[in-house]
Each structure stands twice: as structure tokens, then as C-alpha cells.
Regions:
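Class I S-adenosyl-L-methionine
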Residues: 1-180
Length: 180
């Protein structure tokens, strides 16, 4: 989300921020790998919190001590990068990070935005609680309800549908052949 599209890194997220800013919202975001906070799944998720507030934020302070920083503790970032978001979402679409030659997004794992001003930083989690593995949450097979099991006569069809495929197909309208 923070990096797309490849041709204009960060543009899609900049459009979202521009729209929220245009409506008067202030925004916090965090990219969180749940395994870094003790959960058994290694998957990154982007949390976005937008608030309609008249309160003026100290962006650097909010980055380290805002709602998301309290929910997902972090080590104080070494440095903060500043980005400016165009007020008009159309301008963000056309101009954001274009022609800079940059192969990277200006948005990092944590950030805050108010009135088009963005403070963003690379962060490290500061979680010290218990950590779980998949083994901690797996249910004993004897306790799993019957409807979660695949019937033996449907197993081969299930494996085919869920498995990798390499089939020749033809588009009926154009006659174009492709591999599916």
C-alpha cells in the first residue's frame, strides 16, 4: 500500500492521504508485522487511523506517542523524514514522487499527517511480552468439528482446485490462447 505503484512509488497512499487531508482529517499509520508483537502469524498489515480534529498535532511527538505508538510500542526513531502531500488529490495522482528517479517510497513503516505535512520514520518494535508460535494456538485434531474435514471422495477435486495449474485456455471472444 505504501509503495505502489512501481512507476511512482507511494502515489496511491499519497492520494489517500490527500483525500483525508482535504476532508480535514489528521492521520496516523503503522505497518505492523504481527509476529513482532507476539502473535504466531508473520504477516504485515497497515493500520490507518484518521481523526477529524481541530487539535494541532506535534507530528514528531505523535509519531512516537500517538494512538498507534501506544497500541504497538516502538523504540524512539533515530530520524524523521518529512513529506508534503498536495492538497488536491488529482495533483497527487499526477505529480507525487514523479520524475524524482526514486525507486523507493517516501513513506516508511510509521507516519503521521496533518494539513498535508507528513512525518514518517523507520521504526523498530519495543514489545517485551510473551511470544506465541503456531503450536500454541493449534487445536487438537480430536477437537476439530467434522465439517472442517474434506470428505475422501472430494479430496482429489479439492487438491486440483487449490493446487498449481498450467492449462492452455482460449478466450472465446478474441481467440487468444494463454496459459492459466
Amino acid at each position: 500500500l505504501l509503495k505502489s505503484p512501481a512507476s511512482q512509488r507511494g502515489r496511491d497512499f499519497a492520494i489517500m492521504l490527500s483525500c483525508l487531508s482535504d476532508l480535514g482529517y489528521s492521520v496516523e499509520w503503522r505497518v505492523v508485522n504481527s509476529a513482532e508483537y507476539g502473535f504466531p502469524q508473520r504477516r504485515k498489515r497497515t493500520y490507518i487511523l484518521a481523526r477529524l480534529t481541530g487539535e494541532v498535532w506535534d507530528l514528531e511527538e505523535r509519531l512516537s506517542h500517538g494512538v498507534l505508538a501506544e497500541a504497538f510500542p516502538i523504540v524512539e526513531p533515530d530520524s524523521v523524514d518529512w513529506v508534503y502531500i498536495p492538497e488536491d488529490p488529482y495533483r497527487a495522482t499526477q505529480e507525487f514522487n514523479k520524475g524524482t528517479g526514486s525507486k523507493t517510497s517516501p513513506f516508511h513503516e510509521a507516519g503521521v499527517m496533518q494539513d498535508g505535512r507528513v512525518a514518517t520514520a523507520k521504526v523498530v518494535e519495543a514489545y517485551t511480552g510473551p511470544r506465541m508460535t503456531l503450536g500454541n494456538v493449534l487445536v487438537d485434531e480430536a477437537d476439530v468439528p467434522e465439517e472442517f474435514f474434506i470428505e475422501p471422495e472430494k479430496l482429489s477435486q479439492w487438491e486440483y482446485l487449490k493446487g498449481a495449474k498450467r492449462e492452455r485456455r482460449v478466450n472465446k471472444q478474441t481467440g487468444y490462447e494463454y496459459t492459466y
